[in-house]
Structures are given as structure tokens and as C-alpha cells.
Amino acid sequence: MGRTPHLPAPGETVKGTVFKMGPGGKGFNQGVAAHKAGADVTMVTKLGRDSFADIALNTMTELGMKKDRVLYSDDTETGCALIMVDENSSQNEIVVILGACNTITDAEGDSLEDLLDGAEYLLTQLETNVSSVERIVDIACKKGVKVILNTAPVQPISDEVLSKVDLI
């Protein structure tokens, strides 16, 4: 995340004042918040084998989060977001690179099905490939697990899947 006195116009370079790097993403932030609130959270994501993955894994370890079901890609980098914030207006511009999360396969998703046995909630979002979200929502619905979906960043998702979501 970078702060700057004003956001650049197309083709403009502006000098920033602050730069911070850390873990994040909608799913990660939601999982951490639920964990800190006392929920029994198993983090499910797909990471590359890079320094961004190390940051995420180290943070999960420091927080005492379950990370034994994290998936890995040897071919694709960990997803990241480039965030610029205008210091005066607090307006931001964000570019999300889905990275490894966008490569979750149906087989990988199916391998996580047992996590929903006895689960009360599935908390998910769209910073991943939509087909994996649709598949896990369908599985959760069949198992009677309540589904919470953060619909950002906006991507097309079927009405059939949305009808299975308990909270958007």
C-alpha cells in the first residue's frame, strides 16, 4: 500500500510518502477477523512459492491459525494487490492480481470437501476463480453449511449459486 498527496493521472508519476507491505486480501482479512473474534477458522487459499506466501504463512503462524489446508502452486505467484491511497481525500485505487488463487482446480476444491463436515459457516469471496467458489458453495449447501459471500471484486456469478448464499 502506498500513500501519496494525490493519485496519479494516466501517464503521470507522483512521489509517494508511505509504503507498507503485508498480508491481506478479502479472504485472508475475513479469516483473520473471524479467528480474532474466536471462530474456529481453517484458512483455505492457494499460494505461490514466493516471499508473499512467506508473509501470509508467517502471519497465520503468529496468529495461531490453522493453515494445514493451504494449497500451493509451483507455476504461479501468490496473488497481490497494488493499492494507492490519496492522503487528502482517502480515495484509493486498487489493482488485484489473483495469482495462484485463480488456479484452484476442481480436484483441489473437491479435496477440501471434508472441511465442511460439521462446519457451521463457509466464508468466501471472489478474489479467486469463480468456478471454484461456485463449486464449494454448492457443496456447502448440500451439507447444510451456511454460506457467507463477499461479492468483491465483482465477477459474473450464476443466479443459481447466489440463491444458495445465506448472506452477501
Report residues per predicted region.
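Ribokinase/PfkB-type carbohydrate-kinase core domain
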Residues: 46, 57-72, 84-168
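Glycine-rich phosphate/adenosyl-contacting loop at the front of the ribokinase-like
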Residues: 1-46, 51-62
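Residues at secondary-structure transition points
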Residues: 14, 18-25, 29, 51, ...
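Residues embedded in well-ordered beta-strands
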Residues: 20, 42, 81-83, 93-94
